[in-house]
Amino acid sequence: GMCCGAGGARMWMEESIGTKVNDERAREAISTGASRVATACPFCYIGKRKLEKAIQRLPDSEGIVLEWKSFQLNPSLQTDPNQNTLTYLAETKGWTMEQTLQMTAQVTAMGKEEGLNFNFEKTAVANTKRSHRLLHLAKAYDCQNELKEQLFKVYFEEGKNIDDLETLLQCAEHAGIPQAEAKKVLDTHGFEEEIDQDVYESRLIGVQGVPFFVFDRKYGISGAQPDEVFDRTLQQALDEVK
């Protein structure tokens, strides 16, 4: 999988706009308003904010339900709190540090436009599997969006390790998940099947990168697209429901 952005940060992304999902099986696999995101992808944070703003701009946003699905860009990634994203990107992408700084500066500027403050110097390398366990638990407490926001915030803006138990429990508490429940899920490798199912569904509908947003089971937006793409696609999906 890859991260999807827009504009200058092209090496980090792939994109296709307003895709119509035609495959019947694939459509059955997608719930209304499902968003596939990786917890440690900057474009997912930007895309989340763009989607929220697009929903706010709608004249009638009553009844819109958001559901977050899991997608791991690198499932085998080893957590290393001592390595920051800059050195990790340079090593894995084969970029010079100058290229890496240029790339992350573009992403930081994109984030600024949405009111987000990326801090790639502080962001540590972390496996996100445990954060996805919590994301599935959050569904039961109707606080997926709050948890997702919290995970993005502590990871990208505060440089916290999102594979760390304390950090995850703090995020869970902030979102409204009881500590005992959160701890149990993290201790027992909960929601393994659900995470695998999300990944399977992603493959079924041909998701190449994240974020990938699906509206009303048939319209897809790949990447942190321009606002008008979100506006147009949301409106299109809503018009068909009415």
Q: Would you name each region that the model predicts?
A:
Residues G1-P42:
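Cofactor-cradling patches in redox/metallo enzymes
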Residues I46-I64, H136-K242:
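C-terminal cap of thioredoxin/glutaredoxin-like
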Residues K20, E24, E28, I46, ...:
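A non-catalytic, amphipathic alpha-helix used as a structural packing/dimerization or gating element
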Residues M2-G8, K112-E113, G176-P178:
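Short, basic/glycine-rich phosphate-binding loops at helix/coil junctions
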Residues K50-Y155:
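Structural alpha/beta surface segment adjacent to cysteine/selenocysteine redox centers
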Residues G1, A26, T87, T108, ...:
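Short glycine-/small-residue-rich flexible loop motifs, especially phosphate/cofactor-binding loops
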